[in-house]
Amino acid sequence: MQATAVVLKQGEYRPSEDEPFMSERQLEYFKQKLLDWKEDILRESRETVTHLQLETENHPDLADRASSETDRALELRTRDRQRKLISKIDDALRRIEEGAYGFCEETGEPIGLARLEARPIATLSVEAQERHERRERVHRDD
């Protein structure tokens, strides 16, 4: 059987189940996807910092000040989530370099292209993730 990849617009590549799992081409695809995602987050973060610096003015109106503080708190929470996401992206990039990317940390089985396409930082297969979430619910209910 000959492996074929899905090729989209002019040179745009998309991994296919017909290829060997985590081939060099697939790894390069996911590496670039992760790097692009990280750059988008960093750009948004820089824009947030700039916006926060511009919004340091005092608002004489109490309602305006409260609204501004609420916006600032929301932006800071978003920035914290972005920082955590960058850490997960860096972990995924490290797994690519180590040859562990795309394989479930719990079972060692392939995570699957569809899941990685949707969530490139995934470390668990769908089944392992569901087991993990069930265990969390059981312990949370205790």
Please give the residue ranges for each predicted region.
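Short Cys/His-rich "knuckle" micro-motifs
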Residues: 114-118
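Short functional micro-motifs and their immediate structural scaffolds
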Residues: 111-112, 133
